[in-house]
Amino acid sequence: MDKDLKIAFFDSGIGGLSVLAEALRRFSGAEFLYFADEDHVPYGTKSRAQIVRLSLDAVGFLVSRGADAVVVACNTATSAAISELRGAFSVPVIGMEPAVKLAADSFGARPTLLIATPLTIAGEKLARLVGRLECETWSLPLPCLVEFAQDLEFDSPAVRAYLQGELAKFELERLGSLVLGCTHFNYFKDVLREILPSHVRIIDGIDGTLNRLASELGGGLKLACGEDFSELACKFDAEELDAGGGQNARGKSRQCEGSDESARSEQGKKGGDEQGAEEYDGNSGKIYYPNGNSVEYFYSGRALDAAQLHKIEVFLKRLDAMREIN
């Protein structure tokens, strides 16, 4: 392609940084935009109508900034608004869906526990997805985790007490996997790992989302190691499309529910370790990262100041520490 792709990530807050952080490792030569709707976080306790309106505003802003594709890096916004977003904008809009199918395929002999926001758990899209599975799936709403994450409170006594109390409602020894159904929950992998029995696998939907992104863009994304990531993307038939799928430029539906998480570890080795910022351009507002990537950050449409950018780096460092925990 003649120009670097401009790819936008949208979340109610800082949860979507977990998806952006992985994209910074995997891809090279891309311009990224990140929109955190800090004025209205959390989304998980709002009505569907409110989330649709806020999501349309956020994605509209990102498209006006030249986004070639938008990743809705928020399970709640995907559940509530993905259909409206795809109907309103011509660029590919990729959603996040809980990786319950991946969990069922990998550990289906045992129940799966999905933790998410109340709206995601109550959503019709999740009900349809779970209804197609042949394994037992339990669900647990954890709305307080979003606020803990936003406040940089990751492993405090309050966090531990909250998670221990909520997870105690289930027979954890019976589980095969725990699915993170909210991108904010990636900040708590270490605490979850301590509470869960050692055989229970922690799974998120980041790999599948980035595979779908690469598939939608049809070869426009390059791996940090120089390969064409689209060759690795999983492609499914239109009838398998659900909340996390998308429409490519030719209108053909494609979806990848999940991918082998060993790919994440391998790409981490090839693409570099911690993705710390290398340079800040005060004129453009861009932060430059390894692999030739850059990011412009926005809080509800406003460019970030120095203190806010420093806080972003704190979040990214936390995510780096959580990355290999499963």
Q: Can you describe what each PLM-predicted range is?
A:
Residues M1-D260, R264-N326:
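Non-catalytic structural scaffold of enzyme domains
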